[in-house]
Amino acid sequence: MKVLKPGLLTTVQDIGRTGYQKYGVLASGAMDTVSLRIANLLIGNGENEAGLEITMMGPGPSFHFSKQTLIAVTGADFTLRINDEEAPLWKPVLIKENSTVSFGPCKLGSRAYLAAAGGIEVPAVMESKSTYVRGSIGGLHGRALQKEDELNIGEMSALSQTILSRLSSQLGKQGFAAPKWSVSRGRFLPLKKNPVIRVLEGKQFAFFTEESKTRFYEEAFRVTPQSDRMGYRLKGEPLELKAPLEMVSEAVSFGTVQVPPDGNPIILLADRQTTGGYPRIAHIISADLPIVSQIMPGEHVQFEPVSLQEAEALAVEREQHIKELKTRMKMEWLT
């Protein structure tokens, strides 16, 4: 595949560079890992296969595929076109050779994921193909995609070959073929503007004033333009500590909510540092991380406390849905 237009920020990502944070190496990986995993499953790839993460702000990217290719596109709600024909999201799509795939205006969300059967072929760095642009690590030459870049696609699995073969018989004058069914976005990614995000109390929650603790759950914080894959900087009435707090830097995770001295929270994301020295007021539950990853700058976000038991139940429920999808895919194409 060849990049015709790269868009604002398009990078190669998989689930992330796990196991190396103890050495100070960032995890990176897809912001919305659920959407990438599902895109891969829809076309017979392994869940962690590398795909493209496309930031849907400004003009969208476009790609040329020289060979017949099986793809799936998930994530944000936007218009996908194949050779100027509107094409479906959240389902396997077989495109003809010499086809152009274009990403149009985004209606809701901020990131799309394109997976190709066989996966995007780039060298693995520390067991991951994910791109960390600031460190020039992984992906294609450690950077975002540029116009005229060419990407190779790997060998297809047996399941991918079966899906491609079945859809090939449906190719007609239209530039693509797809099954009638699709995965429900709402089941895996319930997008909503200005979402309410569920959190667990952070280690230093008790060190904030009672007024600030109440405000944290009642205020709608604005996501500022100074937000990126490293973290979302929020703006609202500053949160205050009861007394100055000196901290030793500790490990942080995807979804940690830190409060720097200016009192405006920061949500740490995929390209977060491995440690942080600011008070941690909360941690976003894993079930809501995909929703957070789809928030656009300018939107507002509110926080809602939940129990650890509820957070665990929601995480288990999501993984069960993904397991059911894997089973359904095999039954759909192999029986």
UniProtKB/Swiss-Prot annotation:
Induction text: Induced by glucose when readily available sources of nitrogen, such as ammonia or glutamine, are scarce. Transcriptionally activated by TnrA and repressed by KipR.
Pfam families per UniProt: CT_A_B
Annotated keywords: ATP-binding, Hydrolase, Nucleotide-binding, Sporulation
Top-level lineage group: Bacteria
Signal peptide: none
Catalysed reactions listed for this entry: 5-oxo-L-proline + ATP + 2 H2O = L-glutamate + ADP + phosphate + H(+)
Disruption phenotype: Disruption of the gene decreases sporulation. Deletion mutant grows less well than wild type on minimal medium with ammonium as nitrogen source and cannot grow on 5-oxoproline. Mutant lacks 5-oxoprolinase activity and accumulates 5-oxo-L-proline.
InterPro entries in UniProt: CT_A_B (IPR003778), Cyclophilin-like_dom_sf (IPR029000), PxpC (IPR052708)
Entry GO MF terms: 5-oxoprolinase (ATP-hydrolyzing) activity; ATP binding
EC number: 3.5.2.9
GO BP: sporulation resulting in formation of a cellular spore
Role, per record: Catalyzes the cleavage of 5-oxoproline to form L-glutamate coupled to the hydrolysis of ATP to ADP and inorganic phosphate. In addition, counteracts the inhibitory action of PxpB (KipI) on sporulation, by binding to PxpB and preventing its function as an inhibitor of kinase A.
The protein's assembly and partners: Forms a complex composed of PxpA, PxpB and PxpC. Interacts with PxpB.
Family: Belongs to the PxpC family.
Protein name as annotated: 5-oxoprolinase subunit C
Native source organism of the sequence: Bacillus subtilis (strain 168)
Higher taxonomy: Bacteria, Bacillati, Bacillota, Bacilli, Bacillales
The encoding gene: pxpC
